[in-house]
Amino acid sequence: MYVLNRKGEEEDISFDQILKRIQRLSYGLHELVDPARVTQGVINGMYSGIKTCELDELAAQTCAYMATTHPDFSILAARITTDNLHKNTSDDVAEVAEALYTYKDVRGRPASLISKEVYDFILLHKDRLNKEIDYTRDFNYDYFGFKTLERSYLLRINNKIIERPQHLLMRVSIGIHIDDIDKALETYHLMSQKYFTHATPTLFNSGTPRPQMSSCFLLSMKADSIEGIFETLKQCALISKTAGGIGVAVQDIRGQNSYIRGTNGISNGLVPMLRVFNDTARYVDQGGGKRKGSFAVYIEPWHSDIFEFLDLRKNHGKEELRARDLFYAVWVPDLFMKRVKENKNWTLMCPNECPGLSETWGEEFEKLYTKYEEENMGKKTVLAQDLWFAILQSQIETGVPYMLYKDSCNAKSNQKNLGTIKCSNLCCEIIEYTSPDEVAVCNLASIALCKFVDLEKKEFNFKKLYEITKIITRNLDKIIERNYYPVKEAKTSNTRHRPIGIGVQGLADTFMLLRYPYESDAAKELNKRIFETMYYAALEMSVELASIHGPYESYQGSPASQGILQFDMWNAKVDNKYWDWDELKAKIRKHGLRNSLLLAPMPTASTSQILGNNESFEPYTSNIYYRRVLSGEFFVVNPHLLKDLFDRGLWDEDMKQQLIAHNGSIQYISEIPDDLKELYKTVWEIKQKNIIDMAADRGIFIDQSQSLNIYIQKPTFAKLSSMHFYGWEKGLKTGAYYLRTQAATDAIKFTVDTHVAKNAVKLKNADGVQITREVSRETISTESTVTQNVCPLRRNNDEQCLMCSG
């Protein structure tokens, strides 16, 4: 049997050659990772004439399939893939920069992949950069993290990867700190050690000729006219082209059958317009096929087209009334929630005939809205609960609309001196002011919280978190200056208000490393302390930057300029037990702030996969799940659980089959002790009330908002109403990002041993699980109030709410 080497030459291959290579890469791994076993798997999959690079990929896949035996197999898989990349790429920073800078397109025209100033910087400092860059850190990614980088992030020439992960991180760091090599290297080392990561657009574009590094763009319509609509559409296309996610407020566009003075005609309403936006999102992807364009459309529930809006993403119905590639959100005023709760009427209005509703909030909105009602200016009057149930029905069917509370978002914003905030972004964590002349922008980064756990002492390092939050704050502020803006209105907004968004990933991993169950008092206290530390550190760095460069342009008149911080807007008392807030407020009074907004925990979907952490502040959704890469699907087991089961001698093929049979839950597996069952509860087994409580606890330190998903296995109107009203009453800004549900019946699990599965089902049924009658729309009388329609158990005991019981 022979292989084709990198020169295309035939070469004999032996078991020993493959074994030696795998042994070389198995350093520091668990003894269960047996190179001989891996080698045998590779030999079994080989064929004569296989290329050496394909042989490496086969070896990596073999290890990835074995990762359910022990997580170190995933590390070995990544090492094999990384070693293969290293063989095909240069270890000289300047050489890589030369290739990227001198690249020419198919017609021979210069098409540099990095900017001239970055190229010149690398040549000037090449000796120091080559000394500082640490390629061994490439071997610290797991297989799926490395594959994510390989698929979308590492720069290519003619479809051949040129960058190593360390080159990527160095490029990003230099792109941010082009004028300061020490700060560039500080950022590089912290990112390469996985303490934090900048957001995907920053990783894509930093250091390139057009460094569009911002993640989030928020727009309001230019005008309620053909010119205004298509100018806004063009803005969306230009932003999407450069990898920005978009939130756009459409409540100022007139509704269906509204009079058009210019043509003496009537409007077709929102639906035909949104179908055009839908096709634009499909056509303009984010940077040449890296990921799809994504637009979230925001509307207020008084708009006359609200019912048609709620149907746009549904799978059934007429195609001309659907726009399924957009995401939808409702910007909910408190008045609507009160009317729903009290089972009162709700009037739908056209913004063309009832102007000013989108420009007001709180009492001012209520006065204007009721004035229009009294003057019979509305288009239609419905029961508030009928609209409420239409919202819930759409959420159950499609997972959207997102729910954000307009009054809470405006009342608790440090930008409320600018005007009324009309929408959020694609992921519901950015709350910023927009206008026809300003497109709001936010640059993001996330902190890997699990890196701050001292495993020996079982302690969390708040001092290190404080230090790194300050560095990230400085980085994100620097990006505002370094950024390429796809539209001028974005530059206007970002340079005036200078908001940034710092988030987290791996909070659930942090709890597991510290042995804190997600619902425990210790976890709840740590949750609060983490975000207090981050908010304090970000504010302190913003003050330091303001003392050097001056406060942001629109600072005067903001709550912060009056000594009011985020927790003050929640009427929460925060003492000086951990951080001296009085001293910080004194510094703010003296110097001001460089940034209007600072914290915005985002979903971290891609970057958490790169770093090997659980998403954001979310609990684990399952303890076993699929990861898809181009070469196939792989089972992945929660690595913390796998280690615990392995250390206790409980992990074997039978346990794996039981875990699959129970959809990744361990609650009904009798062999597993109770302490592990508490620690490894999935999100479906955690009380939703506790998740909302923890969101509110950290919310007093989050001056933007947070991407809060809601998880209900079998949603009903009663459960959803209970959950939404609880979040609203707790003062959340984002009440719900996505509604996540579980399928009523599981897909057939071909990999599950049927004998094990039958025993698992018997055990589960024997465990006293109660069957609760489902509540449907038909079982709820429109005569009753939502207060009566909540889960029956919650009426007398909040702790026993069906929505909360997991």
UniProtKB/Swiss-Prot annotation:
Binding of dTTP, residues: 224-226, 241, 254, 261-262
GO BP terms in the entry: deoxyribonucleotide biosynthetic process
Entry GO terms, CC: ribonucleoside-diphosphate reductase complex
Domain of life, per lineage: Eukaryota
Disulfide bonds: 216-442
Positions annotated to bind GDP: 215, 425, 429, 604-607
Gene Ontology molecular-function annotations: ATP binding; ribonucleoside-diphosphate reductase activity, thioredoxin disulfide as acceptor
Activity regulation annotation text: Under complex allosteric control mediated by deoxynucleoside triphosphates and ATP binding to separate specificity and activation sites on the large subunit. The type of nucleotide bound at the specificity site determines substrate preference. It seems probable that ATP makes the enzyme reduce CDP and UDP, dGTP favors ADP reduction and dTTP favors GDP reduction. Stimulated by ATP and inhibited by dATP binding to the activity site.
Domain ATP-cone: 1-91
EC number(s) reported in the record: 1.17.4.1
Enzyme class: oxidoreductase
Annotated positions for site Important for electron transfer: 737-738
Residues annotated as site: Interacts with thioredoxin/glutaredoxin: 801, 804
PROSITE patterns: ATP_CONE, RIBORED_LARGE
Alphabetical keyword list: Allosteric enzyme, ATP-binding, Deoxyribonucleotide synthesis, Disulfide bond, Nucleotide-binding, Oxidoreductase
Classification via InterPro entries: ATP-cone_dom, NrdE_NrdA_C, RNR_lg_C, RNR_lsu_N, RNR_R1-su_N, Rrm1
Residue numbers binding ATP: 5-6, 11-17, 52, 56
Entries under CDD domains matching the protein: RNR_I (cd01679)
Site entry (Important for hydrogen atom transfer), positions: 216, 442
Residues at the active site: 425 (proton acceptor), 427 (cysteine radical intermediate), 429 (proton acceptor)
UniProt keyword Glycoprotein present: no
The protein's role, per its UniProt record: Provides the precursors necessary for DNA synthesis. Catalyzes the biosynthesis of deoxyribonucleotides from the corresponding ribonucleotides.
Name under which the protein is recorded: Ribonucleoside-diphosphate reductase large subunit
Organism per entry: Plasmodium falciparum (isolate Dd2)
Gene label: RNR1
